Swiss-Prot record:
It comes from Treponema pallidum (strain Nichols). ATP binds at residues 42-49. The keyword Cell inner membrane applies. Residues 6-226 form the ABC transporter domain. It is a peripheral membrane protein. Belongs to the ABC transporter superfamily. Lipoprotein translocase (TC 3.A.1.125) family. Its EC number is 7.6.2.-. This is Lipoprotein-releasing system ATP-binding protein LolD. Keywords: ATP-binding, Cell inner membrane, Cell membrane, Membrane, Nucleotide-binding, Translocase, Transport.
Length: 226
């Protein structure tokens, strides 16, 4: 492996359930090098999304260390976490989370404008990405006017708008029919390769996992290389 872009060290997480605490993650450690695709698999409810959310600064861990390049994620306060996500991460979820009153183009542009980039630069980049994900013809359509596959491809374009270091994808094809799932998966993989991005994907689909460079399985709180 080359130098890691992501390093997770002894991360643990538990939740309170009625009268007991449920241990979801137990001393999870792994590292991810640059420009590779990594899959995390496991049964529903085993903690895959929790781990991804901790890496993304969207959930707290009970203990451990998460580093993305020089950024010590678990020590960051809220404002710094927002900057961390803006600077380092592209996020793709099972649900597209597009703003319904914004067009596809506006949805893709929004993170770039929030980051303070020029309107002209962001607009040109957004059109380029919509072309890449093959929905440029829907640039001025609202989410309700688009198919599920088109919405999710737009979400992939949005994740790339700020040229992120690391893309976190949580079951990005989980809500799609097989045909659209294959299209979204192929685009996500091809674009991360083209732009030399690191992809960490949570999936229950063994076919998708088999196409990544490194594969891990989460079992009873422990992460196992497979």
């Amino acid at each position: 492996m080359n130098d890691p872009i992501l390093s997770v060290e002894q991360v643990s997480k538990s939740f309170c359930c009625a009268t007991e605490r449920i241990q979801i993650l137990s001393d999870v450690s792994f590292s991810v090098p640059r420009a590779v695709k990594v899959a995390i698999t496991g049964e529903s409810g085993c903690g895959k999304s929790t781990l991804l959310n901790i890496i993304g600064g969207m959930e707290h861990a009970d203990s451990g260390i998460v580093r993305v390049l020089s950024c010590d994620v678990l020590t960051l306060h809220e404002h710094a976490l927002t900057e961390y996500r803006r600077q380092f991460l592209g996020l793709v979820f099972q649900f597209h989370h597009l703003l319904r009153d914004f067009t596809a183009l506006e949805n893709v542009m929004l993170p770039g404008l929030i980051a303070g980039k020029s309107y002209r630069e962001v607009r040109a980049r957004a059109y380029e990405l919509l072309e890449k994900v093959r929905v440029v013809q829907r640039a001025h359509h609202f989410p309700a006017q688009m198919s599920g596959g088109e919405r999710q491809r737009t979400a992939v374009a949005r994740a790339l708008i700020n040229d992120p270091t690391l893309i976190l994808a949580d079951e990005p094809t989980g809500n799609l029919d097989p045909k659209n799932a294959l299209i979204v998966q192929d685009l996500l993989f091809s674009l991360t390769e083209e732009y030399q991005k690191t992809l960490l994907i949570v999936t229950h689909d063994p076919r998708i996992a088999s196409m990544t460079d490194y594969r891990y399985q989460l079992q009873q709180g422990s992460l196992i290389r497979i």
